[in-house]
């Protein structure tokens, strides 16, 4: 009922500001019950006792009813009466609450559009397709038959006012646009909002839902141009790839594309006609692969750059798009170095008394976890040195022994599960070695002992049961399928279809 009420209000007037004065908006933002299709971490609308406080929400709404304080906050960002002192608790608390509620409201038209599109097409919801690892089987199936790959980054930097203009299509009331600019004024010392994934991560620490929505709306507009070119250049629609893109919420984007095709534009689209082009994106990085010639992929690059520059009114760096031939190129995507390998294979063909040797080539998508980048991430998190030597974690020494073990085991399990698709398993062994010894050093430091003395006292089986759980489960899986011993199991690549979010240590690129 609440969802229908919000949707009707938004469709009738497209006014956002009145919804900010409703208490249930902030409850939805906190309890993460607005839409199960959107993966956000719960918002911290808490008081001093670390519990959800409806009283604080009511106080905030009462202050928002006082238009004088809100107007003065928009006109004078230096003396902000609404947020209070910028270093105070009330300032951060009020800013976070309003921005997260604002993000919930802005998701209404996009979420309702996605749900209606799914219902109209009657496409089943597959939980497996929401996994990040589901991209790699797709690449294994498609990239082996393609010739060129274009490794591109979503254009940035972008001026903050362009984001306001993008949302102006959905938001009609002026106070909401002023409130949006007010949030941007909090970060006036930054030149751009979307500069890198690190910047987005910094923003998401305080306002996860709001800034991730802004980032997704900007990427929406960037992909709008690509989908427009793709739809106009070829009228063939791929059902398999359409179902695959369910995880990235592209149904609403594909369904509501504006069909604008002028006569002068048809000549350009004819040169871009390619029925074997595939597009995959995660966050700010995308892969554009084609079976066509080098000239065709260069035309795609040329027109994408020009359309982006004309649409967003800023210069797009062409060097951010790298075009390479697939058999001779290794591209970085989702924490892996991927490349197409050609393996020569000799097949003996026996026909009656004659035998023939046939030389053939087999292609295979090889994925390798970059050990240098992973060690660099572990070094930044203070688990090891730059050279990969394990060190203790002093900040965790105030925790209990069980909590320290849980922290290390969780990080080790997440990293090893995510990089289980690597063909080089030595990287996983290196990760386990670093985290295991770092855990032992941390516990020894807490108990003011040496690692050797601590390990001798607890026995050689210390930590083994925590780190071998994954290997035991994998052994059971493979023993059910192959009747012979696990020869070459260390080379098997495994993709998990339940990973919906990249760990901070994994997102090292």
Swiss-Prot record:
Where does the UniProt annotation locate this protein?
Plastid, Chloroplast
Keyword annotations from UniProtKB, A to Z = Chloroplast, mRNA processing, Plastid, RNA-binding, tRNA processing
Q: Which GO terms describe its biological process?
A: mRNA processing; tRNA processing
Task: Give a GO cellular-component term.
Answer: chloroplast
The protein's superkingdom reads Eukaryota
| Any one Gene Ontology molecular-function term assigned to this protein's record | RNA binding
Checking InterPro entries in the record gives: Domain_X, Maturase_MatK, Maturase_MatK_N
Pfam families, alphabetically?
Intron_maturas2, MatK_N
> Where does this protein have coiled-coil stretches?
none
The similarity annotation says:
Belongs to the intron maturase 2 family. MatK subfamily.
Protein role: Usually encoded in the trnK tRNA gene intron. Probably assists in splicing its own and other chloroplast group II introns.
Tell me what this protein is called. Maturase K
Question: Which species does the entry assign this protein to?
Answer: Arpophyllum giganteum (Hyacinth orchid)
